Regions:
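Expand to "…catalyze enediolate/carbanion chemistry for C-C bond making/breaking, isomerization
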Residues: 2-198
Length: 198
């Protein structure tokens, strides 16, 4: 369960940015992420919707913006909601609707969605398995990715399937102590409490 008391959108955005810089880019979990971040082409949006329908309206808006904006101006979007999806099961159920939104906005084959959640868990793993941290984030997050960007990045990383295996091996080598040393706000290993001074 996510403790989201006393949060504001600026704090949520900053925590997400630190996760992006320290884990996704810092550990090179996604080799494609650094370039757009350095070029300031990553949009972080914190939804304040009070219900699912409102969140899906925010998703529609961000999908349309991404679809109508050149990649040279906006490469990718992180849509974050700190309170609406407190458990992974609820979040996971929403993903099918989110994928439908891509189709409804006529962006199938153009944009895809990658999910991240504080309690993300791959099928067949234990909750505290370090491999789950490839997709764990401070808050429930939808990463809206241009498929053209993925194809372009794949040219530089032809063995893209090896990235996941490399990430798992890296996290297993780091272990929970190594992960916690990254000091990512609201994203500690399960048996640790989040730092109160974040």
């Amino acid at each position: 369960m996510i403790d989201t008391a006393h949060l504001d959108t600026n704090t949520v955005s900053e925590h997400t940015k630190q996760w992006l810089e320290k884990a996704v880019i810092g550990l090179n979990l996604c080799p494609f992420a650094k370039a757009p971040h350095v070029k300031n082409l990553v949009r972080i949006v914190v939804s304040e919707a009070r219900h699912l329908d409102g969140f899906l309206e925010d998703l529609d808006r961000e999908l349309q913006l991404l679809g109508n904006t050149p990649a040279s101006e906006l490469e990718t979007t992180l849509l974050v909601h700190p309170t609406l999806f407190p458990d992974f099961e609820t979040f996971n159920q929403m993903l099918e609707i989110a994928d439908d939104a891509v189709v409804e906005n006529e962006l199938e084959g153009i944009v895809q969605i990658a999910p991240f959640h504080p309690d993300f868990q791959f099928e067949g793993t234990e909750a505290d398995d370090i491999s789950n941290y490839t997709n764990r984030s401070p808050y429930p997050t939808l990463h809206l990715i241009r498929e053209g960007s993925i194809a372009k990045a794949a040219e530089a990383f032809p063995d893209a399937s090896a990235i996941f295996d490399r990430n798992i091996a890296l996290l297993e080598k780091m272990g929970h102590e190594g992960w916690d040393k990254l000091d990512i706000p609201r994203c500690p290993f399960p048996h640790h409490k989040p730092s109160e001074n974040k």
